[in-house]
Amino acid sequence: RRSSDLNGHEVVLWGREDHIADEINQAHTNSHFLPGINLPTTIVATTDLKAALDQATVLLFVLPTKAIRSVARQVASYLSQSDAQPLLVHATKGLEQGTHLRVSQMIEEEIPRQDYQDLVVLSGPSHAEEVARHDLTTVTAACPNLKAAEKVQALFKNHYFRIYTNTDVVGVEMGAALKNIIALGAGVLAGAGYGDNAKAALVTRGLAEISRMGIKLGADPLTFVGLSGVGDLVVTCTSPHSRNWQAGNLLAKGYSKEAIEEEIQMVVEGIATCQSAYELAKESGIEMPITE
C-alpha cells in the first residue's frame, strides 16, 4: 500500500482506546483529537501493541512523558524476542518527574542498546492539526549519530514538512521540554489582559533561562536559537492552539490544575515539567525565575 500523504510508508498507530482505533480504521478520521481532518486510508490503528510492532522498521514514540517508561518497557519485552532492531524516534516534549530525566534517557534505560539501531529526537514548532492539514512545517531531527538523523530526515520530508538535522540531543530535548513552561506563562499574561510588550519580555527572558539550563547540561548554545529553541518557543507562546498556552490562560482565570486538565481534555506537559525543571534548577544552581 502506498500513499503520497504518507511518503509511501505503511503506518500502524497504537493506542489504548478501542473506539478511537475503530473510527480511524472505518471512517479514517479522529474526531476527538483531529476534528475536520480526513486521514489517509493507509493508516491502520490497533490497541494490540504486539500487532503494531510486528515487522515495524521504525518505531515513533508520541506519548505523554509519564507514559514513556511503561510503554518503552513493553516495547523492550517484544524486541528482546525479535530480530527486528528498528530505528527508534521520539517526539515527546517533557522531563520525568522525580528523576528529571529527558525522554531519550528514559527510553535508553528501558530498551537495551543492542535491540535497536539508533534513537532520534524529532522536535520543533509543529502543531499537530497544522501538520495534518499539510501546512508548511519545519522541525529538527537530532541524534549523536548524524546518519541516523539524516535517515529520519529522508523518511519524513516532503513538500510541506522539512527536517533539519543536528547531533545536539540535549539541546533539542531541553528546548522542547522547557518551552512548555514559558508557554504557561504566556497564557497567564494573555488571561490577565497584558499586551505585546509583556509577551515579548516573557519570551525573551524565557529563552534566556532555557538556554542557561540547557548549557549547564551540556547543550550547544546555538541550538536554542534554532527550530527546537526559539522556533518552538515562539509558536507555543503565541498560539491559542497550544495546550500549555490554554492552561496558563485558564490559570489566570482562576481554574485549578484539576479543572484545567478536565477542560482541555489532553495532556498539558508544562504543568509536570515545571515542577521537574524547578527542582533541577535548584539542584544545578541555575537561575530560572519564570519557572519559579
Predicted features along the sequence, with ranges:
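NAD(P)-binding Rossmann-fold cofactor-contacting core
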Residues: 7-37
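Electropositive phosphate-/nucleotide-binding environments in soluble metabolic enzymes
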Residues: 14, 18, 46, 62-65, ...
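Rossmann-like NAD(P)(H) cofactor-binding subdomain of soluble oxidoreductases
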Residues: 39, 46-54, 58-61, 65-136, ...
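Short, conserved active-site loop motifs that form the nucleotide-linked donor/cofactor pocket
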Residues: 42-44, 161
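Alpha-helix C-terminal capping/helix-to-coil transition sites in glycosyltransferase folds
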Residues: 54-55, 178, 230
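Internal alpha-helical scaffold of NAD(P)-dependent oxidoreductase catalytic cores
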Residues: 67, 78, 106, 110-118, ...
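NAD(P)-dependent Rossmann-like dehydrogenase/reductase catalytic/cofactor-binding core
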Residues: 186-190, 215-225, 229-292
